[in-house]
Structures are given as C-alpha cells and as structure tokens.
Amino acid sequence: MGKYSIDPENPIKSCKARGSYLRVHFKNTRETAQAIKKMHIRKAYRYLKDVIAKKQIIPFRRFCGGVGRKAQAKAFKHTQGRWPVKSAEFLLGLLKNAESNADVKGLDVDSLVIDHIQVNRAPYMRRRTYRAHGRINPYMSSPCHIEMIVSEKEQVVPRAEEEVEVKKVSKKKLAREKLKARE
C-alpha cells in the first residue's frame, strides 16, 4: 500500500483509492481532477460522463498554453477548456474503486464527497522516433500518479432558532417612554 500525501480527517468515515504509473497525460489529468475536487461522488460521475460525451467541458486554468477558447468554459467563469476523454475515463475508474472501497467499509455510498484528490508526475516513459539522415529523437510520454480520498458527508442539522429575549426596561425608563407617548 502506497503512502498518501495527507491523512483523512476522520479515517472511520472515509476511504482511499490510488493509481500509480498511469499512462495518461499529467497536465490533462491534473485539470480534470481539479474540476471534480470537493464534488459529490454522484455529481462527479455525471460530470465526467458528460465530459466524455462533450456535453460539459473541463476548464484549463494552469496548463492552458495553446488551449483553445470554448463557449462551454464560460460556465466556470473561464475562457479556455478541453474534453480530455482518457483522463476522464481513468478518473471514472478510480471513482468506482473508491466507491467500492467505501461499500466494503460500510459507508453510505450516496453521501460520499471527494475530500482530497492529487495528481503527481510519474517518471517519463521513453520511446523513439526515427528522423531523416539516420537520426533518432526521443518520443516521451508523461504518466502520472493519482490519489483520492472520499469522505462521508456529515448531515447538516439546522440550528434551532433561539427565542429573542425581551429587554428588561427599568420603571424609570418605562415612565419616561409613557410620558413621551402622551406628548
């Protein structure tokens, strides 16, 4: 079992899932992960499936050099975005894993929230491409490690409304108010 960058706040009410050396672009996966951070697990499923179907977009905020402007990104108060299908599929698989881990642990699957998600760079994978005049150039890929912690959301109980206390008014002040009311 690998080491996670943080420990969950409440280990009893949360579970973990991770993928190492995944052959999917680091930059795309990082942006996709940021889009589903702090999201309810069912909402994240829907969102990622919509991304695969190109109904919703992933806003590219950090790694946005050369990324085209899209109208769908306006929903996120941003201009640039893409539909990274492979990253969405990998994250869907990881969400399924986290959900089944929660089910085995006995947590309520419908109230799970993505508490922590982090994407780290993995070592580059090296291939080669053949160029003119007998030269060989590198053909690198940038894989990544993904870790996520999902937690059962506590039910928010509305606070009972406190009764407004009536201010105590002294006899002297009450007499003054009565006197002013007569005038």
Swiss-Prot record:
The keyword Mitochondrion does not apply. One of its GO terms (molecular function) is structural constituent of ribosome. Coiled coil: none annotated. InterPro entries: Ribosomal_uL22 (IPR001063), Ribosomal_uL22_CS (IPR018260), Ribosomal_uL22_euk/arc (IPR005721), Ribosomal_uL22_sf (IPR036394). GO terms for cellular component: cytosolic large ribosomal subunit. Keywords: Ribonucleoprotein, Ribosomal protein. One of its GO terms (biological process) is cytoplasmic translation. NCBIfam families: PRK04223.1 (NF003260), uL22_arch_euk (TIGR01038). Belongs to the universal ribosomal protein uL22 family. This is Large ribosomal subunit protein uL22. It comes from Podocoryna carnea (Hydrozoan).
